Amino acid sequence: MTDKEKKPCAIIVVGMAGSGKTTFMQQLNAHLHSKNKPPYILNLDPAVRNLPYEANIDIRDTINYKEVMKQYNLGPNGGIMTSLNLFVTKFDQVLKILEKRAPTVDHILIDTPGQIEIFQWSASGSIICDTLASSWPTCIAYVVDTPRATSTSTWMSSMLYACSMLYKAKLPLIIVYNKCDVQDSEFAKKWMTDFEEFQQAVTKDEGMSSEGATSGYMGSLVNSMSLMLEEFYRHLDFVSCSSVTGEGMDDFLEAVKAKVKEYEEEYVPEMERMKEIQRQTKERQKEAQLSKLMKDMHVSKDKEDVGLTVSDAEDEYNGELVDPDEDDGLTAEDREDMIKQYRVALGISDDISDEKLLEMLTERMKQ
C-alpha cells in the first residue's frame, strides 16, 4: 500500500442548529466502528453540553466557553467564535497529533458548531479548512433537516447556504438529507434535477399561503434563484440518511470516496497553481526590492554609467532640471537603514563593505 493510499479523508460536518448534525456524527461513528474502521474525531463545538460519542480531541478540554463569555463580556455567538479563534491559535499542535494518527485511520471526522455562519464565515473556520485540505483529502458534509426543507423557501435557503460554502471553502461538498426515516427526501432530489417539478411545488406553496401579494413576490424570487442555481446542482452529490436507523450510511461513504477523487483531480492542481503564483509573486517582489536598493545606491545591475542629456533630466511639467534620484522618497538615513536590513536578512557581517554587499546582491539577482 502506497503513502497516497494511506492518507485518511477529513470530513468536516456542518449544518444548521437542529438539523441532526451531532446525531449524524454519532451514527457515522458507530457505523465505521461496526466495519472495524474507527475514525479519529475532533469536536469543535465549545458550547455543546453532552456528546453522544467519544471525541479524540475536544475543544472543551482546552477552552471554557462560559469563562470566555464572562471574561470578554460576550453573548453566546460571540463566545463560540472567540473560543474557536483561541483554539485555532494552537491548531498546529492539533495537526501534529493528527499526522501521528493518520496512518492508522481511514477517516477524520470534524464536528462543528451548530451556528453554521460562525464556522463557515470566520477566519478560524477558513484556517481549519485550509490547513486540513493542505494535508489530506478533505470534503464538507452539509447536513440538511429534511422535514423542514419540505417548504420551498426553506429548501432554497439551504441550497444558497450550500452554494456559499462551496464558493468560500472551494472544497468538495456532499449534501446529506437527514431524518429520512421521518420524511422521504425524494422530493428534494426531484427539485434539484427537475426545474418544472420545483415550479409546481412553489405554485402549490403559494396556493396554501395566506400572505397574498408577498407570497407571489417570494414565489417569483425563489423561482428565479432556482433557475440560476440549476447548473450549480449538477456539481453536488446528495444522499439520504437517517441518524436514528443508520439508513444511507453506506451511500454516504461511497459519496465520500467520489469526493476524494474529486479532491485529487481538481482541488490539488488548483492548490499547486496558487502556490506557484505566490512563489512567483514573492520572487518578483524580491527582485524589485534588490533593484530599488541598487538604484538608491546609484549602482546599476551591470555597474555601467549611463549619461543623461538635458532633455532627459528636464522636468516635463515646469521645464526645470531635476535629479533622477531626487524624488525617490529616500534620504541617506533611509538608505543606511535599508542596507542594515539586507545585512541582517542575508546574515552578512559589518566587516564586508557596501560595495561587496552590492556585488553579492547582484549575483543573487542573476541566479
From Swiss-Prot:
Gene3D superfamilies linked to this entry: P-loop containing nucleotide triphosphate hydrolases (3.40.50.300)
Binding annotation for GTP: 15-23, 178-181
Keyword Calcium attributed: no
Coiled coil: 247-290
EC number(s) given by UniProt: 3.6.5.-
Region annotation (Disordered) ranges: 306-332
One Gene Ontology MF term: GTP binding
PTM sites of type Phosphoserine: 311
GO cellular component, one term: cytosol
GO BP, sorted A to Z: RNA polymerase II core complex assembly
Keywords: Coiled coil, Cytoplasm, GTP-binding, Hydrolase, Nucleotide-binding, Phosphoprotein
Listed SUPFAM superfamilies: P-loop containing nucleoside triphosphate hydrolases
Pfam family, one: ATP_bind_1
Presence of keyword Coiled coil: yes
Acidic residues bias spans: 312-332
Site (Stabilizes the phosphate intermediate): 77
Role: Small GTPase required for proper nuclear import of RNA polymerase II (RNAPII). May act at an RNAP assembly step prior to nuclear import.
Subunit structure: Heterodimers with gpn2 or fet5/gpn3. Binds to RNA polymerase II (RNAPII).
Protein name: GPN-loop GTPase 1
Organism for this UniProt entry: Schizosaccharomyces pombe (strain 972 / ATCC 24843)
Phylogenetic lineage: Eukaryota, Fungi, Dikarya, Ascomycota, Taphrinomycotina
